[in-house]
């Protein structure tokens, strides 16, 4: 950005390299290490350890720690925006517009892909280089038998080499030696053919024995499988029978429990009904007793009131009779209080008669004698 960039002012302090903390000997860790016998410049751990030889100055220096604030893997580099995505495709498009042939474009594309692949492998694997493996110590070269002829490959190679000698040897050797060699070669060929026949026979016998053993093994396996299946079926049948028995027993026990619970509930309901009836009867009896007591008290009070009123009336009548003049000889008709309350007196008299009669009282209160 040049002059238009943001100006960051930095003030250099007394410790610009930030090394004061490394020289501070009053920290908690320094105190603990010194108490354990450590001194500045020494390595941690046993001095006579087997790996103490490999210690260097880096083993006694400070450890650099960086704060990891992302989810990338260890050693992964984040994209800082300096990589242009799609640049190769853009170059491919420009090449087609410029009239490049398809072969050239394909070669460039392959070159770019190889470059990207190599770059990825360099980051992933690093400086590892893979080398073609050779013979290890102690390996033994074994002859591979061909399936068609049953002859080892090494024998065939030797045979071809022997049967095809060089032209220089042919010219140098005399004709007698040629005939001897031919005889020897023919004898060797006969021996090899015999060996081949023997090997073929052995293979046949081996294959027959293997087939017989395999058939016997297969029969044994079939028998074992049949036995295992029978055992499994028997076990399953036994388990099913046990399950049925358990289910029946559980059903019977559950039915018994239900019946017992039903009878208990019925009994409890009956008991509750009886208790309710008894409570109601008791309440009714109490109410009837209270009613009778009230009626008796009311009747007693009424009788007392009627008696007191009758006495008052008789007194009033006597006073009136005494107050009338007796010398005239004629009596004036006076309206007494008895005529006024005649109907009420009759009712009161009937009531008194009823209270005196016990049979009438029983009829009134509906009491069975």
From Swiss-Prot:
Family from the record: Belongs to the PINX1 family.
Name under which the protein is recorded: Protein pxr-1
Domain of life of the source: Eukaryota
Region forming the signal peptide: none
The species this protein was found in: Neurospora crassa (strain ATCC 24698 / 74-OR23-1A / CBS 708.71 / DSM 1257 / FGSC 987)
Compositional bias annotation for Basic and acidic residues: 228-237, 304-318
Entry's localization field: Nucleus, Nucleolus
Record's keyword terms, sorted: Nucleus, Ribosome biogenesis, rRNA processing
Domain G-patch intervals: 25-79
Statement: the UniProt record of this protein carries the keyword rRNA processing: yes
Location of region: Disordered: 1-23, 147-338
Molecular function per GO: nucleic acid binding
GO cellular component labels: nucleolus
